Amino acid sequence: LNALRRFFQIEAHGSSFRREILAGLTTFTTMSYIIVVNPAILKSAGIPAGPSMTATVLAAVCGCLMMGLYANRPFAIAPYMGENAFIAFTVCLGLGIRWQTALGAIFIAGVAFIALTILRLRQKLVESIPTSLRYSFAVGIGLFLTFVGLNQTGMVELGVAGAPVKAGALTTAPVLVAIFGFLLIGALVIRKIPGAILIGIVVTALVVFATHVAPWPKAVFGMPASVAPIFGQMDLRGALSLKALPVALTIFIMAFVDTMGTLIGLSARAGFLDENGNLPQIERPMMVDAIATVLSPLFGTTTSGAFVESATGIEAGGRTGLTAVVVAICFALSAFAAPFVSAIPAQAYGPALIIVGLFMLAPITRIDFTDYTESIPAFAVVSLMCFTYNIAVGITAGFLLYPFCKVVQGKAHEVKAGLWALAALSLLFFIFYPYK
């Protein structure tokens, strides 16, 4: 244990061995849904569900291990939710592109990430982002998580004509159990009980099973499916065709801004940013993200990156890479316990996402709302992330609005060259983004 403490510098980060383990368990619990949801989405693209689940686990295990052992950060890596839906429903079903070609486009984007990271260009781009935008990423992700939690628990539903959303059936058993989970976690947080989020998830899950809101797991263990049918099946030649190149560009920009916003947002909440709002040694988590993006299509799944649900582990006290390693171990074990892991219902982990959304609002006090050239772009980031249900749209809007506001004010010289480059990429993002 002493060797682990020294390797991860646990005491230097103001943490403890027990806290890191608890944080890893908490993070895994809130993101374990990806094991089931990712294959379910990619099945629409033609990727078989069994091998896809194994590929999801492999991508998560490799990404989390690299993040923990190399970057020493408590950020969990797994296939992104937004990108998998983009590939399945827009690229494959909408544009008629084969899933093998789509995976080839993801691989190309990953190689570009690695090149930019080695050349330190990704780091320079990040450092060109104003602090107001960086903190708005954390706030926006927080509201995004809150909205996800409200929707998954049934507290908020798709609205009728004239109203985009509406209150769910708040008196039904599933929603009542979720409300119980929210109140329980809130009470535990107020009382400053260690492991409040994880305790809340476990207790709420037991209540869900006991009240028959969701069925008890039919089995606990089972052998994972072989990944052979989809391993290494990406089509690089097809990905370089004129039809697929816009897809590769869109994937590149989506993954770039998603990862950038998530890393900075999580780092702001964890207290990792320095006095200038920069993340020290940011090239390490960025390199992990780039390598994970290359490995994912090799395994047979879509873009991987830092998960916003890592915020739950950070709130539980996770501050080192040991948290990510624990998440990796949990994912590895989950390959043999998929029936049990998949049984954890949204009513159990949804309330945790809502509470974490509250926690992530803290950086909003560091945004200067008296300077409209700072507050208008920040407001756009936060509102668009939440109301478009798309993190990338919010971030890219901020990249475009900040230079615009400074130019209008006559202070274009305050905009760094890197931000102009990000604005250009953001413009391409909106041009090529598939809106249907």
PLM feature segments, named:
Residues 21, 41, 125, 195, ...:
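Residue-level signature of catalytic and energy-coupling elements of molecular machines
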Residues 46-65:
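Loop-to-helix transition at the N-terminal end of transmembrane alpha-helices
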Residues 1-51, 164-168, 198-283, 426-428, ...:
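Helix-loop-helix hairpins and the membrane-proximal interhelical loops
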Residues 95-206, 210, 325-436:
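Membrane-embedded alpha-helical modules
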Residues 16, 32, 36, 53, ...:
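Conserved active-site and cofactor/substrate-binding residues in soluble primary-metabolism enzymes
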Residues 63-76, 186-192, 251-258, 289-299, ...:
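Transmembrane alpha-helix interface/packing and boundary motifs in multi-pass membrane proteins
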Residues 49-50, 75, 99, 391:
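Membrane-helix interface/capping residues of multi-pass secondary transporters
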Residues 2-38, 59, 80-89, 93-138, ...:
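Helix-loop-helix junctions within the multi-pass membrane cores of secondary transporters/permeases
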